[in-house]
């Protein structure tokens, strides 16, 4: 090989390495770009942006074209490198007593390592990092050439795509032609947490976004005020009784029932008092002002509950269980508080649901298990209960009295029983047969000898 051929071969290798870089940059920039960004730029951008949009609409096809281009340029680089390496002089190796065969093998090895390393760095790694760091700018530079290459080699790309899809189907998997751009709520929650840890989102914003995304996974049963906490009025009660009930309970909405909550005929709001002249309130029945009330099943998801509650006259719905009995009531305030946290007004109890107390926490028995976990760090095992009082009742096996204590099993971050950490629950206050207030204490290892189950 003369000098001219050698120079031409080196230039060809450099050009092929650059070609590999173009295909790698096109592949990574197209996968890094978000669909919404591509569409927005195509509407108000240049012809290059419309090329990017065209490529993004056939992403699987373009990625296959990029892979084919990478394979062709890499193979061509190896093909040109081999005769060039064979011509490399090695008199120094022969001079030290090394045979021609060993010298040829050694020089070929080192030459291939150098060429391969340069090709990997400049043909693959550098373009990849550029594309990931600046996907839009990179795509504008390389995608037009990528689209043209894929157009010219369409038959070959379709052939390789068809063969690959056939093999994947034989493995029992249906090939996906495009990358999935949508994300599940769980994936979005994970992204929010990662963004908060990296400092891209402040903690308050991340907390609000996380609760908003998790809202749809909750059910009406988890969102409602339970039946035992509802104050109802009878059909023969009057507006004056509504005033008295509002003053005594601090509530603003009341179901109107015939006998009990399983026969709810409507809903009234304390603001409706002002629709009736003061002199008529003592003998105006609630049924004359009651509004129809929406009814939702206890298994309905949070988003659907929100839609029905917002559409109802007084933004309230009754929740029924699988047997048709009333399980509770859900209001718009309940739903908003699930997203933004407690919204307290002058009628609410000033005592918060969770209060730090010494080495533990005093918590309302009505708190859900996930709310307890968020507030205290205690993660309960799965079971047939929704609230912390339900868990304690299950562990005790009977209706407790104030002062009873039970040891609770905790789960670790992976959802496995954590034998290194135990929790002690003490009943502080009962409301009839319902646990109204509990104290949770975190203990290391096992409970002390004076504590136990059902003491």
UniProtKB/Swiss-Prot annotation:
Residues 2-205 form the CNNM transmembrane domain. It is a multi-pass membrane protein. PROSITE patterns: CBS, CNNM. It comes from the Bacteria. InterPro entries: CBS_dom (IPR000644), CBS_dom_sf (IPR046342), CNNM (IPR002550), FAD-bd_PCMH-like_sf (IPR036318), FAD-bd_PCMH_sub2 (IPR016169), Ion_transp-like_CBS (IPR044751), Transptr-assoc_dom (IPR005170), UPF0053_domain (IPR051676). GO terms for cellular component: plasma membrane. Pfam families: CBS, CNNM, CorC_HlyC. GO terms for molecular function: flavin adenine dinucleotide binding. SUPFAM superfamilies: CBS-domain pair, FAD-binding/transporter-associated domain-like. Residues 224-285, 286-346 form the CBS domain. Keywords: CBS domain, Cell membrane, Membrane, Repeat, Transmembrane, Transmembrane helix. The chain crosses the membrane at residues 6-26, 68-88, 106-126, 148-168. Its main location: membrane. It is found in: Cell membrane. Signal peptide: none annotated. PANTHER family: UPF0053 PROTEIN RV1842C (PTHR43099:SF6), UPF0053 PROTEIN YRKA (PTHR43099). Belongs to the UPF0053 family. This is UPF0053 protein MT1890.
